[in-house]
Every structure is written in C-alpha cells, then in structure tokens.
Amino acid sequence: MQITMGYLQENLRQQTLAGIFSTSQPTISRAINNVLNILDVVLPPPPQPVDLNPNRLYVLDGTLIPCWWWKNARNLYSGKHHRAGHNLQVLTDQAGEIFYISEPLPGSTHDITAIRSTGLFSYMQPWHCTADKGYVGLGCDTPFRKRPGKPLLDWQRRFNKGINQIRYVVERSIAHLKVWRILSTPSRLPQPTTIRAINVIRKIMFYQPPAEPYFPSN
C-alpha cells in the first residue's frame, strides 16, 4: 500500500522506488498492480450524474491527464493540448467543492463530446452549469465568443468577466486534484493500468470511511 500510494502521489520511476525499498523493479510493478486491483474492487464507486442534486449550481471544466503515447492508441493525442492523455470532466459547486469526476476518455475527445457521454444533462438542466467556451452550444452559462470584425459590447465583456470569476473555482479544484502527480505528469504505466489508477483516485477522492466499525451479527 505504501509503495502504491507513493507512486500515485509522486509518480516516481519504479526503479527509484525499488532502490528506496531495497527490492527489484518487477517486485515494485507487481505490488502496484496488485494494490490497484484490490482498491478498484473494494472502494465504493464515485458519484454518478444520477447522484447529483439537480437544483445545485455547478461549475464544469475538462482537463487532460497526461500519459505515455502508445503507438497502438493514437486517439490519446489531444490536438488542443499537443500531448497524449486522458480527458476528465470535473464538476464543482460555486465554492469549489468537487461533486463529480467523469471516467477517463481518450485525450482526443472534445469536451462537449466527453460531457455528453456522461449523460449528465439527463439529470439536470445545462443552465445549472457555468463553463468555458469549449461548451458553447450545450445550454450552459458560457462566455460570449468574439466574432471576426465584431468586437464584444461592453455588457458582453462584463458578462464574460463575471463568468471567468465563477469558473476560477473549478480551475483551482483541478489544480488541487492534480496534487496526485500521476494526474499531472505523464504516467509510465501500461494504458489499462493507467486508467485503473485514475479510477482508483476518483474513488479515493470521494471515499468516506465509516464513522464506526461494522461487525455483522452471527
């Protein structure tokens, strides 16, 4: 467990961890895989769109989780970010508390496509979400786009400024999420293990330990 948590938090090379724990790199690799498999099974699932309060006001943004670019997974490359990774959709309230993190999708997935795939707006109205220009057309509160040869009006600029002030909280929350360095620096794990690691962190972020130990009756 200590090895796996250290790996997720610091994204150290497995050879480095092998030196720290006086063992071999294959042993470190097996330990990480075994613990990730166990955590993925025993941790409760993270919140789903159906679990969210549809009357709450949210802030929505996407982020790229960088990873190694495997030749057999060309869809991981994000033209927007010019690197390979996985797309995560993050939903916070207007105070910045994270309420939802989507499953990872290939980095080439556009934010609109990614959020549609979650089914989020089957459970709430899109205007309950503030988002950036990448979500224009969904019905969310988004900034006005400047059209060629048509500068924004003063009230539109003020509106955009207000939207950006609201959106700041989700950007800050994503930065806090990426304290897990496996989410902010390219992972060297195989692609299936990388996805499993991301999903384990999603579960850890929402895990609430029982207030009291539970002992089933005979």
Give the positions of each predicted feature:
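Short, amphipathic alpha-helical "recognition" segments used to contact nucleic acids or chromatin
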Residues: 1-10
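Short, well-ordered secondary-structure "scaffold" segments embedded in the functional core
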Residues: 10, 14-218
